Amino acid sequence: MSAPVQEAISNFDIGARIRTIAVTAVVVLAMAIIAAPAAQAQTLSILHTFTGGQDGGKPQAGLTMDQAGNFYGTTPQGGAGYGTVFKLSHTGAGWVLSTLYTFQGGGSDGAGPIARVLFGPDGALYGTTNAGGDSNFGIVFSLRPPITACRSVQCPWTETVLHRFTGFGDGTNPGYGDLAFDAAGNIYGTTYFGGQGGIGVVFKLTRSGESWTESVLYSFSDSGNEGSLPYGGVVLDSAGNIYGTTLGGINNQGVVFQLSHPGSSWMETVVHSFGGPPNDGEAPYGTLIMDQQGNLYGTTYKGGTTGAGTVYELQPSGNSWTYSILADLPAFSNSGGPTGALTMDGAGNLYDTTYGDGFVGAGNVFELTPSGSSWTYTDLHDFNGQDGSHPYGNVVLDAHGNIYGTTFGPGYGEVWELTP
C-alpha cells in the first residue's frame, strides 16, 4: 500500500484559535537538528525478514509484546494470500517466527490485517482485518492459543470471528485503527468508511456469553466541524469517554474528538480542529495515547512549521482542553511523517517512527525527551532502504530500553530491534 491517503489537504490560518505552545521547544528542536544532524549511535538488528510466503509479508502495523518478551504482529500479505498473525520468540538459536493464524479471505474469514493485534482482559488476542467477511468490508476477530501443549514451533491458534461488517450501516473497513477495551471487556474501534454518512463510525462490541453484538456509537457526517474518515483507533478514559482523531473537519485538516454519554445517546465534542501549516499540524493518522493524568498525545502526518508533521499534547482543564505542539518534526526529506501511535516510557519520553522522513526518505525512529517546559528531539535511526524502509506502525520498548518495530520494505518487510 502506498503512503497514507488524503495527501493533499489545503492550508488554513489558525487565526485567533487559542493554542498553547512551549516556545522553548521550538528553539531546542532547532538546536538539536543543527548540533546533531545525523542519527544518534544506535545498533539496528534485523530479527526477521519476511518472504511473502507462509510467514507473511508487508507488515503495516506495529508490534505487541507479552510479559515473556514475545512479539505479536500482523501482515496483510502472504500466508494463503490474505495475510497472517505472527509471533516472534527468542530462543537459544535466536529469534524464531511462528505463524499463529493464516487468514482465508472470502465470506467466512477476514483478509488484509493492517492494524495491531492486542491482548484483551481475558488473555486472547484481538484484531481487525480491513477486508474479507460477507461483503468484503472487514471483520473483528479473536485468537486463542491451543488448549493442549504444542511442542512444534508452528502451533496454530483458534480464530473466532466476532463481527463481520455488512455495509454502510455498521461501518466498513476498520483499517489501521487500534482496538480498545473497557473494564468489562467490551471492544471499541473505528471504521474508515461506512455509517450513515459513509465516512466512518465509532463502534462497540458487547459480549454476552460466547456471542458479541455490534452497536454503532457514532456515525460521522462531516457536517460543520465534526470530522470524517477516522484513520486511527480510540482510547478511553476512566469515566468511559472515548477519544480519537479524524480527517476532515471545519478546516479540512483533521480533528481530535471526544464521545461522551450524558444520556441515551453518544455526543461528539471537537476537542481540537487542526489548522495546518505553518502554525499547526494536519492529517492526524495515528491513534492517540493517554497518560495517567488524562493528557492526550498524538501526531500529525504533515503540517507544522516544517511541513513534516508534529507531535502534540492536549491537557484537560475542567470542560476545556489546552493544546500544545511539543515538536515540529524536522524535514530531512519531507516524504511522510508519523502514522503510528506514540509510545511513552516510564520517564515520560515519547517514541515513534516516520513513514518517509530521515535523510534518504525511507523513514526514521525518533525520541522526544521532556526537560521542563521544552522537549528535545533526537533522531535515533535513519532507515536507508537496505536495513528497512517505510515503517507505518508504532514501536514497543522492553525493560532494557531496546526498541522494536516493523518496516514495510525492502522486499516484503522486516521486524527490527534498535539497541542503545
Q: Residues of each region from the PLM?
A:
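Extracellular beta-propeller repeat domains
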Residues: S2-P420
